[in-house]
Amino acid sequence: MNKELSGVWKKQEIITFNLPELDSLKGYDLFINLRNTNDYKFNNLHLIVAMNFPYGKIVTDTLEYKMAKPDGTWLGNGISDVKENKLWYKENVTFSEKGIYKVSISHAMRNNGDVTGVKNLDGIIDVG
């Protein structure tokens, strides 16, 4: 369920996907998969993730993830300049409402001291 990007994640580009039908009695750990290249200029990542429930409830989370060690070494897996990160989103979630759950992800990155957000986030090649 990953959405491929062209190496740039535009501020207005909201990545949306529907979750598959899941067992309503089982708890699920949810992750966001993200791949970045050396063109990514930040050591962290801020995301806004919204989950729309079938009966209309919306839960929105603002999340921050560490993307690099203090020395600049990328976190994640991969031997080339592409690193794959499995980012925690929610733990032990149950899906008790019958119907389609929709997840929307957008980035909320800013440069230090800048009030306006980064319009084009370079170095992100897919999210899901």
Which ranges hold each PLM region?
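Exposed low-complexity, polar/acidic, P/S/T/G-rich flexible segments that act as propeptides
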Residues: 47-48, 52, 112-128
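Beta-strand-rich interaction surfaces with strong enrichment in secreted/lumenal proteins
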Residues: 3-7, 17-20, 72-76, 90-94
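Extracellular beta-strand-rich recognition modules
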Residues: 30-34, 101-107
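Short acidic/polar inter-strand loop motif in beta-rich domains
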Residues: 36-39, 84-89, 93-96, 106-120
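Start-of-domain marker
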Residues: 1-50, 56
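Solvent-exposed serine/threonine-rich low-complexity stretches and specific carbohydrate-binding patches
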Residues: 3, 61-69
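Long, compositionally biased, intrinsically disordered segments
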Residues: 8-11, 24, 94-100, 107, ...
